Amino acid sequence: LRGREKDLSKEKFTPEKDKLEEKYQLDLSEPVILVVQHPVTLEMDQAQKQIRETLEAVVSWQYQSVVIYPNADAGGRSMIETINEYTKYPFIKTFSNIQHIDYLSLLNEVSVLVGNSSSAIIEAPSFGLPAVNIGTRQMGRERAVNVIDTDYERDSIQKCIEKALFDSDFRKNAKECKNPYGDGKTSEKIVDIL
């Protein structure tokens, strides 16, 4: 048993798809890229360059994209400035934050998660969601087969997004992957044991 798992049972949180589309101005019948990238403490002087490389790779696909602002760590403000430059593209939607239940619902509906958020490692496998994990922030963490690791270079990121979106074998493996952080049923298992 692993402790403190999140219950990610889809039937418990997924709002109606049309409400999600309306709220976030998306067409979920088309590809959607979700971008969540935070500053890395020991690389804060590179935060702006790192998010720019990511967004350049994302923009090259011209798919509807949801970009969530980074956390409040050092370097986050400069990343937000850079993110806001990309709102000139009509397919880029930015949000300072998203309610947790909506975030989980987006993980259930989008085509790929891109960035360096721990949710690529911890939550995304529960949804079979392909994830492009960029840089060193999640280094050393166990991960499922849904994760593609890459560096902060737009060409590498672009190729990884392509694999996540179009490699049918990779997508099949991601869809069927086992979450190394559990299935969200720790409480039930504890009750059964007791």
Name each region found by the language model.
Residues 1-194:
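Nucleotide-activated sugar donor-binding and catalytic core shared by glycosyltransferases
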